[in-house]
Curated annotation (Swiss-Prot):
Family: Belongs to the glycosyl hydrolase 5 (cellulase A) family.
One GO biological process term: cell wall organization
Record's signal peptide: 1-17
Main localization category: secreted
Reaction catalysis annotation: Successive hydrolysis of beta-D-glucose units from the non-reducing ends of (1->3)-beta-D-glucans, releasing alpha-glucose
Enzyme Commission number(s) of this protein: 3.2.1.58
Name of the molecule in the record: Glucan 1,3-beta-glucosidase 2
GO molecular function: glucan exo-1,3-beta-glucosidase activity
Amino acid sequence: MLISTFIISSLLSIALANPIPSRGGTQFYKRGDYWDYQNDKIRGVNLGGWFVLEPFITPSLFEAFENQGQDVPVDEYHYTKALGKDLAKERLDQHWSSWIVEADFQSIAGAGLNFVRIPIGYWAFQLLDNDPYVQGQESYLDQALEWAKKYDIKVWIDLHGAPGSQNGFDNSGLRDSYEFQNGDNTQVALDVLQYISNKYGGSDYGDVVIGIELLNEPLGSVLDMGKLNDFWQQGYHNLRNTGSSQNVIIHDAFQTWDSFNDKFHTPDYWNVVIDHHHYQVFSPGELSRSVDEHVKVACEWGANSTKENHWNLCGEWSAAMTDCTKWLNGVGRGSRYDQTFDYDPSQNQNYIGSCQGSQDISTWDDDKKSNYRRYIEAQLDAFEKRSGWIFWTWKTETTLEWDFQKLSYYGIFPSPLTSRQYPGQCD
């Protein structure tokens, strides 16, 4: 846990600086009052599948190709490329205007949530030569911030897709590409972040936006971590050079939980928050765990978070204990759980169970419902040991394990959020 806070003089007339010592003695710094990550809890949802398409969240957009006997695009890049600019713009305008509306923000607030994370791709603000992407997302983002303000919901703006892709995931916009650090791609991402910082990082949105995430899920195992660290630093300083003390959110790049304890902690860095994403469904070993083992791992996440020097929270997690959701692993890639994951034979050697009816609540018996409730409650307790949590995702078209609305409706997600049927799992 973090201990006492004391005030020191600031060279900036706009804010005070508070060095906060960790258990290990390292200090990190706070300025301004966008959000008190030290004492207040974020309880939020991601607005996934809105400005960055994901086939598993809105499969109908992609099934339209399948229904016409065409190849199914694997990501937004290929979706827009297949349709062409005009038709892609028409379909995506319809999607942007209907997937998330004011009623969603009202329902989010009504569920006791206080926060949304809004993923958006670089292409919403700047296009590369020959990019097939279409634009128009920005006006919907601006409207979303107005709705958030109306319902007292705070927001992170999350750069979810970078030029060339930072991870090769379909949710970066471009699957199976790892070109983020090649050519001008990194600079384009920095230019986009500069635009986001200039527009959304200051006082105009200071009562709504409480963080700008520099980059979602950069895949540290395939990227040059030295260059990635340079990117984070440049993005941080570009925001600070606007005069803003807005919180800077840094995803952990899938490094170990303590990897940032000695980074971004000098007086040159303040209001830095580390974003961890926690799932247990993307390897056969994780999928084979019992519910007790899932709970144990979740509680370990929480315990580790208390030992970190920086404020940190879980910016993505779900109820999933299978990878059965259609296209969760990508278009055409099947599931490890039922041994249909043909993409990687090394991860497709063991049959764990059937995916039949896995997302249909009518097939869930009481024991299964209880197990999912236990796992959700354990994660909530774990993540609230520090700054909070952001569930992935607010809603989907068809899946259950990843859908906050459906899980809440069926009583599997606690309501109120602090109610517990299985208290003390992480004590």
